[in-house]
Amino acid sequence: MANPLYKKNILSIADLSRTDLELVVQTASQLKQSPRHDLLQHKVIASCFFEASTRTRLSFETAVHRLGGSVIGFADAGNTSLAKKGETLADSVRVITSYTDAFVIRHPQEGAARLSAEFSSVPVINAGDGSNQHPTQTLLDLFSIYETQGTLDGLKLAFVGDLKYGRTVHSLAQALSLFGARFYFISPEALAMPDYICEELTEKGIEFSFHDTIEEVMPELDILYMTRVQKERFEESEYRHIAAKFVLSADELKTAKPNMKILHPLPRVDEIHTDVDDTNHAYYFQQAGNGVYARQALLALVLNEEV
């Protein structure tokens, strides 16, 4: 079968089909079990982070090195020509992509990755653009879910915390809607899942419901996906009241299925108590580690006709 991701821009999870997603997950699984060190040999990848990042940037760069490639780029846009000399993003992309085989970008502005693709001579991979999309986070989430559940089909998932501004839950809901998931949304009313996501799910015949507490749905879940309630969006007293409702402790896991796993895009603050870390349900650190394999798989597929 031809590789559908070869030379493709990866800008939004909505641009990828069920077949595309399965291919990345299967390739990530293969690379984790049987490492390859030649798939990016003689390839140079631009890693251009206009916004702070730890896990995404380091896992991308690790993925490139482990596949035999090289990385150029920056983690501090303040020292680039864009900041110092007023160069446009379009001009920067034109120049940088003339040096490289792929262009990985994180940018605070929504739509920056799609704009970059208009001026790039090589495939563009979106490593996060504002509150819009973060497709490679979704790919590592899917890989982690598949790794723990043995399937992506027909799973029951709860999303907890900031569902309004959290780009990870938007993309993951869109992706898993292709696999017949059932969703439980648990958040403050002010941070509820956006209408456009709910409308998309309804159009696809995907079941979802809204809840006030995790305990209501815990026995049903295959995956519990926690996110941080962002303190800066509330008054201090209101934040303390809201955040306290969405803190997970080990005691609350007593009714969970034995193989239920907890995921979190990290960083966590107070929303998962440290006593959860030692339970067999905690999988968020392994999830972060899977970022290397998911990004290896994506880079290998985008830059090789056959993998």
Swiss-Prot record:
The keyword Transferase applies. Pathway: Pyrimidine metabolism; UMP biosynthesis via de novo pathway; (S)-dihydroorotate from bicarbonate: step 2/3. The keyword Signal does not apply. PROSITE patterns: CARBAMOYLTRANSFERASE. It comes from the Bacteria. GO terms for cellular component: cytosol. InterPro entries: Asp/Orn_carbamoyltranf_P-bd, Asp/Orn_carbamoylTrfase, Asp/Orn_carbamoylTrfase_sf, Asp_carbamoyltransf, Asp_carbamoyltransf_Asp/Orn-bd. It catalyses: carbamoyl phosphate + L-aspartate = N-carbamoyl-L-aspartate + phosphate + H(+). Keywords: Pyrimidine biosynthesis, Transferase. Carbamoyl phosphate binds at residues 55-56, 106, 134, 137, 266-267. L-aspartate binds at residues 85, 167, 228. It holds the Pfam family OTCace_N. One of its GO terms (biological process) is amino acid metabolic process. Belongs to the aspartate/ornithine carbamoyltransferase superfamily. ATCase family. Heterododecamer (2C3:3R2) of six catalytic PyrB chains organized as two trimers (C3), and six regulatory PyrI chains organized as three dimers (R2). This is Aspartate carbamoyltransferase catalytic subunit. It comes from Tolumonas auensis (strain DSM 9187 / NBRC 110442 / TA 4). The lineage of its organism: Bacteria, Pseudomonadati, Pseudomonadota, Gammaproteobacteria, Aeromonadales.
